[in-house]
């Protein structure tokens, strides 16, 4: 707990702080654990005032226990499951993106990560009538691509325009810009009022590796700290504001085995609750626009489950698509 200082809580004045410090009571813990009758006599302070002060400090700094039933009820009221609009992905995600969680899509360049993110943004904005923040860090987003996806969903130009208004795009090409965006967003969303256009429900970051990878390795020791700060911001945003966070990540080759693995290392692997791998190399011959999607991390479903999705069909009206489970 913190050091006692004037203004730390109502009723704690500078004169009171000086008197307490003169008797060796310098922190909140010192005051909470002290014999208040003895403190009142030695410091010449009102016993009732000290009791009231301790109650305020306990309320302000203590952790209050919750029973499991209350936590479960809170979870039910704060959690929403948002369909991605892609049937095969929803299967692997146990119905869709969960608010309060970070979901990661991993894949090599050209595997279709951005296409999936754009489809999710278009579906949430049009189909679910909710707002989306799309943070683009690799220049992969264009308004024409989003419009094309919306045109595949509805011929109504007013509906297309309404969906476009629900998708806010921010470009952040380094980690400091991205941290600023997320911190500003947390402050703005915490004060937002639900409107007819819906509240923010999905944050897409495409991609985290683009801003983090340049900071890792070599002598850049601050890189790991900045990466974990970004991780905290994303998880806090998801949990405290009940939004679903969808991020993309690159693949890298393991130095020892030579096998491909998700970038950003072991520390980052604990950030996403769910991780999907987009792979265009499985099966004999070329898959073309088809991709194999493998569930490699999940709190709800067994890992190793696979589905296939046709990226070429994601811009067409019937884009739920053929898919095969394994």
Curated annotation (Swiss-Prot):
Residue ranges, annotated region (preferentially binds ssDNA): 1-83
Any one Pfam family match given in the protein's UniProt record, by short name: Rad51
GO cellular component, one term: replication fork
Single GO biological process annotation from the record: telomere maintenance
Domain of life: Eukaryota
Family indicated by similarity: Belongs to the RecA family. RAD51 subfamily.
Protein name: DNA repair protein RAD51 homolog 4
Organism listed in the record: Bos taurus
